[in-house]
Amino acid sequence: MSANGCGELRLTDDQESRSRRLHKSALIIDGLSGHVVNPEPPPVEGKAYIDRLIESGYNAINVTLAAHADDLDDALWEAYAHFNLLTAVPEKTILIESVEDIHRAKAESKIGIIFGFQTATPIGTHIERWTIFHKLGLRICQLTYMERNIFGDGCLEPENRGLTAYGRQAVREMNRLGIVVDLAH
């Protein structure tokens, strides 16, 4: 019996071989990774987080540049920290700006870093900031982080008023630029 009480999963040699082939051929993307920097996760068995991701077969991870009530300065600081990581270990990482970059990360056995926001508060009412952050590599964004902001209601708001005028404008701009609208919460 396993620790979770559900029993042990046993595969036949054929099933094991098939699952390894499928895993190796698939694109593996973590839609919301833990922190890669600020702080960097501690080594496990002497291996850095990036190395563990590569060994596990990940091809890309979505790293958060802004969450909760983060502002413009917070988001820029996180972008700077992740650019430093990309510069420090270019043999292990690549900034993801397109689908082709994800395929390249897989082909080169690197971890693709996808910049994401869990709130659009760093954008504020400045529509031009979408273009600026897109040029910095932003490719995925939740408009709200659970609570209401100028873009709309988050999942914790009982009224559920949906998107505001700014929110609708943001979705149009994100669609124009190719930034994924994340609906997680």
Question: Which residues fall in each region the model found?
Answer:
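Catalytic beta/alpha-barrel core
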Residues: I94-I96, I179-H185
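N-terminal hydrophobic targeting/anchoring segments and the immediately downstream early-domain regions
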Residues: M1-G162
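Glycine-rich tight-turn/loop motif centered on a GG-T
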Residues: D153-R172, R176-V180
